[in-house]
């Protein structure tokens, strides 16, 4: 397929695909799916070999968030029966992090519900970061505390944080449909604050909220322009008690296409399969490792994940290897200049240098030779054949409980 050859060539050179090419990946047929995975896999292996980075989530403060994000079980007014607790103490968080590290995690992600941290909260998290680093100096620590105020990113970095996560989640044009208590611009501002403070920026998306193909392409191109080092791709976990509990639009094949498109648009970035991996990819998880080079180990913030040992078996059985603590995740050109990778290299097709980063465009069919025809009108996503509610389980172990964590 000429389209895939073009995308591989561009990915190996870090050139930006067109929006038409990106959308074309999302509308490939099931007959072409393995070809799509193989093509994106060439790009993944070129930049990241066969390594898989393991990340481990520690939910520092769960539930009772004042924001109204419709996808979130911790949102204002959520009726989801999740764990609710206030801030973990540094020694509790450090113990939870140690479980993930012993299970093979290279990065620990410290997450707290809420609009954003107060200065006292930053002090609290700083103490937690120091406790984790004292226990294991080599572990990477990523903070995810919501919207940042001036100076807070710098304080987190001084405390030892390596990265900061704040996802864009969806396209700017549809952001108001999922959240009304803050704006898309607020999120962009926080990612930029992390960049400016010298933290490795991490920002991604959520697929499966009823968005169109154009929305997915739009948010991934916006992420490319923001230039994070890590792009987590979440697949919506429709939790009972949230407004999106009935949104079951994803199939394993759809998830693979989304991951492949993300890899083609962000070829040299850590693409992480995040929440919803087990629920939506299911038995196709091994194929997804040919597209992404990073996953979360064990459980998520409020829902259970696959058993930690099963994650390790998945990686080994698929012919991949866990990235070691001494290995550098990012390609040399990105790792050498933190925050200056994807958009800072030479060449007119550089990541972040494309035209019309926020416009919508698409490609519905090919007119021979890989030429994209005009995009069709946006369509409502088709629901999966049967919602797999049996695969959604609320987390009842690990942080905030007396039970051992899943790592």
From Swiss-Prot:
Root EC class: transferase
Gene3D superfamilies: Aldolase class I
Residues annotated for [4Fe-4S] cluster binding in this entry: 65, 69, 72
Cofactor note: Binds 1 [4Fe-4S] cluster. The cluster is coordinated with 3 cysteines and an exchangeable S-adenosyl-L-methionine.
Gene Ontology process terms (BP): biotin biosynthetic process
Sites where the protein binds [2Fe-2S] cluster: 109, 142, 202, 272
UniProt-listed InterPro entries: Aldolase_TIM (IPR013785), BATS_dom (IPR010722), Biotin_synth/BioAB (IPR002684), Elp3/MiaA/NifB-like_rSAM (IPR006638), rSAM (IPR007197)
Pathway: Cofactor biosynthesis; biotin biosynthesis; biotin from 7,8-diaminononanoate: step 2/2
Keyword flag Transcription: no
Cofactor(s) it depends on: [4Fe-4S] cluster; [2Fe-2S] cluster
Reactions performed catalytically: (4R,5S)-dethiobiotin + (sulfur carrier)-SH + 2 reduced [2Fe-2S]-[ferredoxin] + 2 S-adenosyl-L-methionine = (sulfur carrier)-H + biotin + 2 5'-deoxyadenosine + 2 L-methionine + 2 oxidized [2Fe-2S]-[ferredoxin]
Record's keyword terms, sorted: 2Fe-2S, 4Fe-4S, Biotin biosynthesis, Iron, Iron-sulfur, Metal-binding, S-adenosyl-L-methionine, Transferase
Record region (Disordered): 368-407
GO molecular function: 2 iron, 2 sulfur cluster binding; 4 iron, 4 sulfur cluster binding; biotin synthase activity; iron ion binding
Classification via PROSITE patterns: RADICAL_SAM (PS51918)
Quaternary structure and partners: Homodimer.
Family (UniProt): Belongs to the radical SAM superfamily. Biotin synthase family.
UniProt name for this protein: Biotin synthase
Organism: Streptomyces coelicolor (strain ATCC BAA-471 / A3(2) / M145)
Lineage: Bacteria, Bacillati, Actinomycetota, Actinomycetes, Kitasatosporales
Gene this chain is encoded by: bioB
């Amino acid at each position: 397929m000429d389209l895939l050859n073009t995308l591989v060539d561009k990915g190996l050179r870090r050139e930006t695909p067109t929006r038409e090419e990106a959308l074309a990946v999302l509308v490939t047929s099931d007959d072409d799916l393995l070809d799509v995975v193989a093509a994106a896999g060439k790009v993944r292996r070129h930049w990241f070999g066969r390594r898989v980075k393991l990340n481990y989530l520690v939910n520092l403060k769960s539930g009772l968030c004042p924001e109204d994000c419709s996808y979130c079980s911790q949102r204002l007014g959520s009726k989801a029966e999740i764990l609710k607790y206030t801030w973990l103490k540094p020694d509790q968080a450090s113990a939870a992090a140690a479980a993930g590290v012993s299970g093979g995690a290279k990065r620990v992600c410290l997450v707290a519900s809420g609009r954003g941290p107060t200065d006292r909260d930053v002090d609290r998290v700083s103490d937690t970061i120091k406790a984790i680093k004292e226990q294991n100096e080599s572990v990477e620590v990523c903070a995810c505390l919501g919207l940042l105020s001036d100076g807070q990113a710098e304080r987190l970095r001084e405390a030892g944080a390596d990265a900061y996560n704040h996802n864009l989640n969806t396209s700017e044009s549809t952001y108001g449909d999922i959240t009304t208590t803050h704006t898309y611009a607020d999120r962009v501002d926080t990612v930029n604050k992390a960049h400016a403070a010298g933290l490795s920026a991490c920002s991604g998306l959520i697929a499966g909220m009823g968005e169109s193909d154009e929305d997915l392409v739009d948010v991934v191109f916006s992420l490319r322009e923001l230039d994070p080092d890590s792009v987590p791709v979440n697949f919506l976990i429709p939790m009972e008690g949230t407004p999106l509990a009935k949104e079951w639009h994803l199939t394993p094949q759809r998830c693979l296409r989304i991951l492949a498109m993300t890899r083609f648009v962000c070829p040299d970035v850590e693409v992480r399969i995040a929440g919803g991996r087990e629920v939506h990819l299911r038995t196709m998880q091994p194929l997804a490792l040919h597209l992404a080079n990073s996953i979360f180990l064990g459980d998520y913030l409020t829902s259970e994940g696959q058993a930690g040992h099963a994650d390790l078996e998945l990686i080994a059985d698929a012919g991949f290897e866990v990235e070691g603590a001494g290995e550098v995740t990012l390609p040399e050109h990105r790792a050498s200049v933190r925050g200056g990778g994807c958009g800072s290299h030479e060449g007119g097709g550089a990541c972040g240098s494309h035209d019309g980063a926020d416009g919508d465009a698409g490609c519905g069919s090919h007119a021979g030779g890989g030429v994209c025809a005009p995009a069709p009108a946006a369509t409502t996503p088709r629901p999966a054949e049967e919602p797999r509610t049996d695969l959604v389980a609320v987390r009842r172990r690990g942080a905030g409980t007396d039970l051992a964590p899943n790592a």
